[in-house]
Amino acid sequence: ARSRKKMLARERIEYLLDKDSPFLELLPLSGLKNDSGFGPGGTNITGIGLVSNKLCMIQSNVGTKKGGSVDYATSYKSLRIGEIIEKNKLPTINLVESGGVNLPDQDKIFINAGKNFKQITQRSKLGLSTISLVFGNATAGGAYVPGMSDYTILQKNAAKVFLAGPPLVKMATNEIS
């Protein structure tokens, strides 16, 4: 990340928060007993903090941890966070850099991912805004969150949002993209 002049996930959170705002990190040990090799907390840092003097739920993908790809712990964590958002009527800010679903875990993740996407649309209907800021690759499932957000900001010359890369397009259609 440093060699590419990118901020780390926690630095992005600190930069976003109001000066001297505390950050209450939620579910940092999610997936502690998971054997997928992702370690505790999954591939996002999530918590509550003040942004423009308003309590917000902040979710930051850890792009330096398996490309921010989503494992079971991360998908479960997102569902639980969605419940907390709705119960506490919080707007959400996503700091996105995600390779989408970790393919070896996809059979364990797709149901949770679908529920998570449904939660995003339900929150929008309730007037609970979702804002996404994309800092790097947002691939496949990682592209859905900014695509479904009420507001999306893409970092100039860095953000890339796509559902499939050239190898997958070639495999599926036999065409070069």
Question: Positions of the model-derived regions?
Answer:
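Intrinsically disordered, low-complexity segments enriched in small/flexible residues
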Residues: 1-56, 60-67
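Short glycine-rich loop/turn motifs
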Residues: 42-46, 55, 90-91, 117-120, ...
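A structural preference for short, pocket-lining loop segments at secondary-structure junctions
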Residues: 49-62, 77-104
